[in-house]
UniProtKB/Swiss-Prot annotation:
GO terms for biological process, alphabetical: MAPK cascade
Active-site residues (renumbered): 1453
Protein name per the record: Mitogen-activated protein kinase kinae kinase bck1
An example Gene Ontology molecular-function term: ATP binding
Region: Disordered, residue numbers: 1-73, 167-199, 211-253, 345-399, 455-555, 568-633, 739-820, 832-1144, 1164-1277
Task of the protein: Mitogen-activated kinase kinase kinase (MAPKKK), part of the cell wall integrity (CWI) signaling pathway composed by three protein kinases bck1, mkk2 and mpkA and responsible for the maintaining of cell-wall integrity balance. The CWI pathway also regulates the oxidative stress response, as well as the production of some secondary metabolites including pyomelanin.
The protein's enzyme class: transferase
Family designation: Belongs to the protein kinase superfamily. STE Ser/Thr protein kinase family. MAP kinase kinase subfamily.
UniProtKB keywords: ATP-binding, Kinase, Nucleotide-binding, Transferase
Gene it is expressed from: bck1
PROSITE patterns in the record: PROTEIN_KINASE_ATP (PS00107), PROTEIN_KINASE_DOM (PS50011), PROTEIN_KINASE_ST (PS00108)
EC number assigned by the record: 2.7.11.24
Disruption phenotype: Leads to the formation of thicker hyphae, which appear less elongated and form more branched hyphae. Results in increased sensitivity to cell wall integrity inhibitors such as glucanex, SDS, congo red and calcofluor white. Impairs phosphorylation of the MAPK mpkA.
Amino acid sequence: MDGQRQQTYIPAPPPPSATQPSQSHMLSLPPPPPRHLPTQPQGVMPPPPPGPPPGPPPGPGYGASKLANSQLQQQNNLGWQHNWARQALSQGFLPPPPPPPMVPTNQAYGRQTSFSVPNADGPITSATYVPGSNTFGAGVGIPGFDAHTRPSYEAYGTMSGSDRIRGPVHHLYESSGGDGSAYKRDGTVPPTPSARTMPSSLALHDNAQESVASSLPGATAQNHQSQTGQTNEPTKSPSHRQNNSNTLLGGMSPSEAAVQWPLDRVLLWLAKNGFSRDWQETFKTLQIEGADFLDIGHGANGRGNFNKMHNEVFPQLAKECEASGTGWDKERELGEGKRMRRLIRQIHDDDSFDVGIPAQKRRESQAPSEGAPDTSPKLSHEPQSAGPHSGTIENSPNLRAPQLAQPHRHSVQMRSVTLPIPTTHDIASSDFSQKDGISSRSDFSRSVLVGLGVDHRRQSPSMSSDNGNLVAPFRSYEDSPKSGSPATQHATLNQGLSSSSTGDLSVKYEHSRGNSSDSTMGRRYYESRKGQETIRPSPQEMCSRQWTGETSSSYPKEHKGIFNFLKKRSKGGDSTHPSPEEPNLESPTSPVNLRQNGPHLPYTKPSFNASDMSLGERPSSASMSDHERLRGKPAQKGKKWSFVTLDGWNYRLVDITDMDSVETLRAAICHNLGIADWASAQIFLTEPGQSDHEEPLNDTMLALCRRTKSDSIGSLKLFVRGTHLQPVPNHVPNFAGLGVPLPDKHTASPTHHLPRKPLDDEALSRIPPQPQTGPASPQLGIRPQQPKTPAAKFPARDAPQHTEGMSPVEGDQQVGISPEPDKADLLARHEEHKREVERKQKAYLSSKGPPQPRNDSYGETGYRRAGVIDFDERRVSPYEDKKADTLVPLRKPPSAPQESYTLTRINSLRKKDGDRPRAQPAVQTHGLGAVLASMGRMTSAIGTPAPSVPTPTSAGGKQTNFGSFGSPTQGNTKSAPQSSPEKESLDNPGNPAEHRHTKSTAPEIPKPTLQSRKSYGPEFDFEETEVSFQRSPRPQDDSDEDSDDGLFAIPLSNNKASTKENDSGSGTSEAQKRTEKPALTVNTESRLRKGLSVSFRSPSATRESFADANGDSGGREGASFLMAASPEDERPPPRRDSFARGDIWASRPPVEGVIDNLDDFFPDIDLDAPYLDGQGVSPPSSPANRAPPENDLHKKENQPSSSYTGEMNANAGDTLGSNEPTLKPQGGDVVARRNINRSGGGLTRGKSIREVAKGANQASRSRSIHTGNQKSGEILRRKSTKMFGAKIMQIKPKPGSRLSQLDPIPQNNTPSGVPQRQPTFRIIRGQLIGKGTYGRVYLGINADNGEVLAVKQVEINPRLAGQDTDRVKEMVAAMDQEIDTMQHLEHPNIVQYLGCERGEFSISIYLEYISGGSIGSCLRKHGKFEESVVKSLTRQTLSGLAYLHDQGILHRDLKADNILLDLDGTCKISDFGISKKTDDIYGNDSSNSMQGSVFWMAPEVIQSQGQGYSAKVDIWSLGCVVLEMFAGRRPWSKEEAIGAIFKLGSLSQAPPIPDDVSMTISPAALAFMYDCFTVPYRDSSERPTAQTLLTRHPFCEEDPNYNFLDTELYAKIRHVL
């Protein structure tokens, strides 16, 4: 019989007519003895009467005859054709009439080629199994476990399909014939071979062993279930069609398919396999059923009907998705289609696959527990012959050889897929046994099945249904919880690989991949054994498939069901469960399977591998895994994981699947991290690498995050900030393998009792009680995470602790619950390892990461620690990347300036001066220096407005401290003998330079000098300068000293006053004065930058004052350093809001606002550094600049070193005068002489730029304003100083640096002894306030007279200059022309040109500063103007335009953006970049080119054609400006440039006046625009001139009642600041 079965499996060469040979072949087979017909469980249709063609029993031939097509033959080739009457079994429905005869060459992909071709006359099956007390299976009479050797099995395998059908048709097991008819038969009733009674699908199955496998009881059950809607897991039989059948659909003929797969069953199948309602509606609409349905997955070519899917199904599906509101997701639906094809292919392989068995259930049920006998008798009892895995090879000798012989079958198209094994399968299997009347099932098998968890029972449907052969002996293995699918295990184990389904059965979602497909078949294996062992493929097929690694998982796709994915994931967590993606899973016998299932699995042996499904029939696990991947494991309703971390380094995996309540979730997370007080812990969303966490998650957000972000791959990552992880500071945290300390037993929740702490005797003794009893979540109990300790940073390594084969959570739980001795031993070792890890972690954390728990004692007043807390020493904050700047009462000092070349020279000069003995008494209080040193240079420099600036000791030897406020120096100052000379005060760390200076004076001083120099290199220079200055204050030179004192010792808010005080006061009195006026500080830093001069900070600056004018040179240096370090210095030049946005370039503050906010507009300038001559307030006009040559001379002397940023020049010279003398070892008298020179004969102190600017502003207010059309209420107009012909030096700070740090401001120095003939103006450039076509406009201030002006700078790219010299020359010439043209213009409505400065690659034009903004910017910002404003502005513009035309100047670019509007309502024409001077202003000049802005151009400019144009183009542009002011937008606002050019040039059209404008403005205004827009036909003479419009047009009449200050526009623009 084995041989016969083999023959049955071996497809006979197709006879001329497949029907006849197959029938004859079937006829040759003796029908099995009639058996009592089992009731048709699960709605199985009663066996149909014998098929109309009274032919041979349903054997391969029968099927062939029915299929009568090449497909059938191919399937026969697959090897399923002959072997099994599965077709009959799989069909619960009446078999369709046999198809026309065809050659029975249906070999399943040549699977049976290894077998000898059975005789056509020979019976497909040698005999029919007679059910016995120990048999099971619907009508199959499957022998009891280990009874495979019974001839009945063999006979059963050879039974004709009709015979089987008779019995099986009634059984719960549905044949996977694809018809969906559950030919579930009583296991006790042998099917009667009858082609008639067998459904066409059965015949097909005969041809296709896979189909037959589906017809196995399991398959039948499935099919039937699918039809009946029951959840019983029918076994699937691989479709031969999938393999090689060309004519067979799903292993059945079209007629069989129609019977097996009616539309209802198709829809049910779709629903059970998780396809959306859109898919169901699509199939319903398209009436896809029967052969059409099966054809989708396995067409005639064995690949599936892609055309139908893409041309019909997907278009209709898209419509359904849109109609249902789901939305068409092409990628998703393509994936679904792919999954569907795989599932249908599995149906072909195992017809019962789809039958109403949810993939999830199947998976669960199919997975037999590892090492346990198959829970389903079907599995264990299925004869090997029934399927590749059906019987153990041992049971059926034929199986072994065939398996080996048919390995090629595994290469069949069948893909092994991880299929969810419906839990119902096991249930179904048990149900089948009952329903089918399979009392024959042995009690042992039944007990085994019962023992298996539903999940574990999950059998490989392919095995149960397709192969129908389950090795009974392997039941024990199936029981093994680790075998996800008993069948799979058997089959896959044989191959050495078990699908993830073979993994622990404990995991519901066992992976039923290729291997799993075996497992799925295994499930069917139970069923098939139960219901249709007759349909089992020949053992050969089974063996071959399994050995080949082919897994005919009935549910390759089903496994991909959501639940399957979940199952897989859960298993995946377990080391024993390979992830579905494991490629090794493809082979049922892959080592993975063996590993997971262990040697106990039934299929570890080749014989066991023989399952009903041939490996070839089974879809490869790879395909299954692919499907699962495609499907997305998240779809599994499995575990949800979250990564939680205490330190952002080490993450704990927490199972939050069942954490429905927020409290439970928080507790679980905190317990896993070892946080005892979970209620007070804060949880934040985080991502790897994230360090800052803003808001902790509240309960609502935490629950939302859990729902939306948690998944099986741990996408949800949480950062937990606990209060006290380890309540006992001395307690050494226990570490789980992850390196996370475990909470103490008392701190951990009961669930955390797992012995994760270091296992000492006590811990070991606690292990038994520790089993968590119902922890909120297994993880909680399982994994108490250690509290956030240093160790927490290390990646958790407890994972090893989890028992193998369990998910970490499970492992923990088990450990806690029942630690075995060996486990305890293991835990002990782990604990030892943990201790080591903990130690390392502590070391690591101590060096990196959050600070470790404080060891300090905590008292009522807070933490206390031993030792002295030095508040001067800032503690390092873990939250700061860089050391915070030392806190000081004043502004932060900028970083110490780098010593520039100038400073170097100055230093050298100063050194020389320092080398000179100073008059200062050598007696210097070391205490002062020491104190200052202890305070730190920053403290000394910044801590006090004026760090002690001891005045040089008076001649009497008294040391005058220049107000070192609060510094020890002052105290010393009081005692002149103690206080060191100014140098000494310089000795203070704050005054490094002073130290240097003192260095020469006394050795003590030099040391401090060195220190100070280290800290302040540049200060040293200043100090030296101060030293020299100090010399001048030497006691010997009382006058100098006094002058020095006046300059440095006594900080005065008023420079003059300070000067006076300095002159009069003694050193001590000066120090006192300083004390009185702490606001005044000497800006040594600025001095440093100047290099030559010492500058004082005005009280407003409140920067550290120099300790001493003379001796404080070093102190000044420190002070200057501090001043340089002042926040102003450090602060990046802020761009004022008014200049920050391009739309308000013109929103410039009035001059008063600029003066009041000089620091904002000149951020890099030390405005308080005294650098101007002390002649008094320099008048706003150039005369101030024209300082007497003496002053210049004196400045020159002082300024070489001091030349500050221009601001500090004169005063710096004065202040630095002392220093300068140091540079120029001239003695203290030099300072006095310099002062005298500056003042023109008397000692004076320099003025700061701020003072000069304020004085100029006040003077301008006090004097009458000379403005052409001054209006009431308009702001006073300044007459700016013309600088043409004068020498202009522009001083601009380098980006990010204070001007004081730059080279000294050039001083108005004239050669000594030579009178200064040419006035020199030093212009300090400030903020950018505008951008133009040809350059940028900066705010500027005349350092000599305090006037505010605008600096228009045009820079030429040096590269461009080198490449295009001609262009550069042309540009320069144009600029020169503009300057020459405009320098003499002076009109209240024209921006004044004040001067220019030419550089090698730039030209700077100095213009009158106009506050407010351009009319264009105001329009854009505030909208259109009211008519009264437009009228006034038009009149003013015409006035300026008439003046220009009178001067022979064409503006040629008149537009709103080029008319500036002052805050007083005065407008001024600006931007003469393309203006042109001509003799005949109103005569057309052919040389005039097309210049200007298109939208404001006159037609003649565009149409010039050599005729040229006159100044009347400006009148046209003025009309455009008026229209622009009325409309609030540019002319031709609806046209692009090209359109405007066309209409102007070709049509000579004027810009249209919008209706909203024409309807609201006065007729005079409208007439004015029309007059301006006069289009010249021959020339522009018809257009009025500016003077005509100004004097004669009614719109330009002056309104005596108009006051700009009362207009809405003024209200909008007045708040510029």
